[in-house]
């Protein structure tokens, strides 16, 4: 016979961004708890609102499965003394298992007998296991936590109720000074406290109190209501996935409505209006069927449709205040002079240990000069890049960005166009922030891409130079994101810029305000981001490519893909093993590896030396790999007919030199001795 278990934790309002991850975590930890306690079940469903986290297990076994375990003890010769009596070693072993020497049996393993005992544990009833769910709740982790009411413990928010039901059976468990009961709280304004009748009646019991416990149902309600408004007014409403997820975690009983604002505000840049609505007010944007922004918005109320007109007026009033600010800053910022703002950046701190934003811009400008040549920019592009690098942070001192910091770069583009700068300069100022997330949009223009790389590289090197290096999950200056951005941009544009050579060049630059250090740490940090970009590539292949001598990002990623592609083919294992053997022996070469043909003693070493001399890796990675694998028979013949570590030192070093030259060329693809062929 199966049962159904419900666990609900009632809390103060949770931050919206915490709700969904916490709900997921609760479900995963409940499943692990049941598995650990040998309780089978059919399904787990989780629930969440801003004021509760809950999980329901259906088809739950009414008792644990029985457990039978075998334990291996000491060898028989240790377990028995000369008289055949059990020794203290044997007695201590069985006592530790809660058994006696009468339970001992001997089993033979590889010709020797050992003590074995079998322990059987009869499964307990599910009722005896249910109290353990409190430990599941205690084990939940959160990005922030708090103390309350003078308590020593802490949690994401103060706890108000705990409901644990096994079908209709109530468990009065204790959790953080809260006594469990079947009482749950309804909607803060529309509902009241209610008793949950059973695990299966949970959603309906709360629905009567204006709480939609299932987030999927709440989400569908919001979407359906928005679609209804769309159809009624003939408009298009942008349902942003992130905004939708945030809004559904702000309400327990959603009601969507449309408000409006004066069309005069449409003269302000669209990005300002959208930011005001989406980021600050959590409103959905409304457009006409051609995509043109309309003076309307969609909001979602935490409640029903009663007195909705008053709610609409209140939301419109709040939004207008925001739009007034935007209109004011748009008008006033156009009176500012870009060069004046750039000069004032001398007084804005980039970081107290590093210097001002203006100094950061100057260093970035010097880096762009180096990158422009390596990226093959045209004369016009180089001119635009120099101008963009000279002014690209100016908009940080505008009123608009001061009020709406999400618009940095975006407003810089608009203000530079108004000031008569070229579209390329304006676009680069917007694009230099890209990507803003791990999978974020990349710059489209070469000028913007180079400026983005330069800005990020100076940021990375500057923070490393003063010892502000990310450790563990701690990365307060988002240096991992910046490095990932550099790697992604280089890959996307296919620029053959070797990162090790680039970093060497940057360290050679002499900046008055800062001297770069920690070069090795920077290189390891960049390699870690390339490793991440390789995704699910096997670890040994990643290590082989990262250990190679070619540090062009696009080449490294292509090499890893090529190795994965051929790893299942028949010639992969023998070819890699041949190259791997060459790599291992080449490490023994001393000094500069030069080959003297006069020291050859057989045709096989001559053949390998000639093959290595003519080897020029070219074309796509798959072609280069074929070139290397084609050497496998020549390498094998060399090893079969040649004693590499010959007694004659000159002959030995000559043979090692052949292998050293081979591996030097092969290492431009990967260090093959890092690949596991077993």
Swiss-Prot record:
UniProt keyword annotations, A-Z: Aminoacyl-tRNA synthetase, ATP-binding, Cytoplasm, Ligase, Nucleotide-binding, Protein biosynthesis
One GO term in the molecular function aspect is: ATP binding
Q: What is its main location?
A: cytoplasm
What biological processes does GO assign it? arginyl-tRNA aminoacylation; glycyl-tRNA aminoacylation
Kindly report, in one word, the top-level EC class recorded for this enzyme: ligase
Q: Where in the cell is it found?
A: Cytoplasm
This protein's GO cellular component annotations are: cytosol
Which Pfam families does its entry note?
Answer: DALR_1 (PF05746), tRNA_synt_2f (PF02092)
Q: Which reaction does it catalyse?
A: tRNA(Gly) + glycine + ATP = glycyl-tRNA(Gly) + AMP + diphosphate
Q: What is its EC number?
A: 6.1.1.14
Could you say which protein family the record assigns here? Belongs to the class-II aminoacyl-tRNA synthetase family.
How this chain assembles, per its entry, is: Tetramer of two alpha and two beta subunits.
Question: What is this protein's record name?
Answer: Glycine--tRNA ligase beta subunit
Q: Which organism is it from?
A: Streptococcus pneumoniae (strain Taiwan19F-14)
Q: What is the lineage of its organism?
A: Bacteria, Bacillati, Bacillota, Bacilli, Lactobacillales
């Amino acid at each position: 016979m199966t049962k159904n278990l419900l666990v609900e934790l009632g809390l103060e309002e949770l931050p919206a961004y915490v709700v969904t991850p916490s709900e997921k975590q609760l479900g995963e930890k409940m499943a692990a708890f049941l598995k650990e306690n040998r309780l089978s079940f059919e399904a787990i469903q989780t629930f969440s609102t801003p004021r509760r986290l809950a999980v329901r297990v259906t088809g739950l076994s009414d008792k644990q499965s029985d457990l039978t375990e075998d334990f291996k003890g000491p060898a028989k010769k240790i377990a028995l003394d000369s008289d055949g009596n059990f020794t203290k070693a044997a007695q201590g072993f069985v006592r530790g298992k809660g058994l006696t020497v009468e339970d001992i049996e001997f089993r033979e393993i590889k010709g020797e007998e050992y003590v074995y005992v079998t322990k059987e544990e009869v499964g307990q009833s599910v009722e005896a296991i249910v109290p353990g769910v409190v430990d599941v709740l205690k084990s939940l982790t959160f990005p922030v936590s708090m103390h309350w009411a003078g308590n020593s413990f802490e949690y994401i928010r103060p706890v108000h109720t705990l409901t644990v039901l096994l079908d209709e059976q109530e468990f009065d468990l204790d959790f953080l000074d809260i006594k469990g009961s079947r009482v749950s709280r309804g909607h803060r304004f529309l509902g009241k406290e209610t008793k949950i009748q059973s695990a299966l009646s949970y959603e309906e019991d709360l629905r009567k109190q204006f709480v939609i416990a299932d987030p999927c149902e709440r989400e569908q309600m919001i979407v359906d209501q928005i679609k209804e408004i769309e159809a009624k007014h003939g408009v298009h409403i942008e349902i942003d996935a992130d905004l939708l997820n945030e809004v559904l975690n702000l309400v327990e009983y959603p009601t969507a409505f449309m408000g409006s604002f004066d069309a005069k505000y449409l003269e302000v840049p669209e990005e300002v209006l959208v930011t005001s609505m989406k980021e600050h007010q959590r409103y959905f944007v409304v457009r006409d069927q051609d995509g043109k922004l309309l003076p309307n918005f969609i909001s979602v109320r935490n409640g029903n449709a009663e007195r909705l007109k008053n709610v609409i007026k209140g939301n419109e009033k709040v939004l207008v205040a925001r739009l007034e600010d935007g209109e004011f800053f748009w008008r006033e910022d156009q009176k500012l002079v870009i060069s004046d703002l750039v000069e004032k950046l001398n007084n804005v701190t980039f970081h107290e240990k590093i210097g001002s934003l203006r100094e950061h811009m100057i260093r970035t400008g010097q880096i762009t000069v180096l990158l422009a040549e390596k990226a093959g920019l045209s004369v016009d592009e180089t001119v635009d890049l120099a101008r963009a690098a000279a002014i690209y942070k100016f908009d940080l001192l505008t009123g608009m960005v001061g009020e709406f910091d999400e618009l940095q770069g975006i407003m810089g583009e608009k203000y530079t166009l108004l000031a008569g700068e070229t579209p390329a300069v304006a676009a680069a100022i917007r694009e230099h922030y890209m990507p803003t997330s791990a999978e974020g949009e990349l710059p489209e223009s070469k000028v913007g891409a180079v400026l983005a790389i330069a800005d990020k590289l100076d940021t990375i090197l500057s923070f490393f130079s003063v010892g502000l290096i990310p450790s563990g999950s701690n990365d307060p200056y988002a240096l991992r994101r910046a490095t990932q951005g550099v790697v992604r941009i280089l890959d996307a544009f296919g620029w053959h810029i070797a990162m090790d050579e680039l970093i060497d060049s940057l360290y050679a630059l002499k900046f008055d305000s800062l001297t770069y250090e920690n070069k090795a740490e920077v290189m390891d940090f960049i390699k870690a981001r390339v490793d991440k970009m390789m995704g699910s590539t096997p670890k040994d292949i990643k290590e082989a490519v990262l250990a190679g001598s070619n540090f062009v990002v696009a080449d490294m990623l292509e090499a890893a893909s090529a190795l994965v592609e051929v790893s299942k083919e028949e010639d992969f294992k023998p070819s890699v093993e041949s190259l791997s053997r060459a790599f291992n022996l080449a490490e023994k070469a001393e000094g500069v590896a030069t080959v003297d043909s006069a020291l050859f003693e057989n045709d096989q070493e001559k053949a390998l030396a000639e093959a290595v001399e003519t080897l020029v890796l070219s074309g796509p990675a798959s072609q280069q790999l074929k070139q290397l694998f084609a050497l496998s028979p020549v390498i094998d013949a060399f090893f079969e007919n040649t004693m590499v570590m010959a007694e004659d030192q000159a002959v030995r070093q000559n043979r090692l030199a052949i292998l050293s030259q081979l591996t030097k060329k092969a290492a431009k693809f990967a260090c093959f001795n890092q690949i596991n062929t077993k």
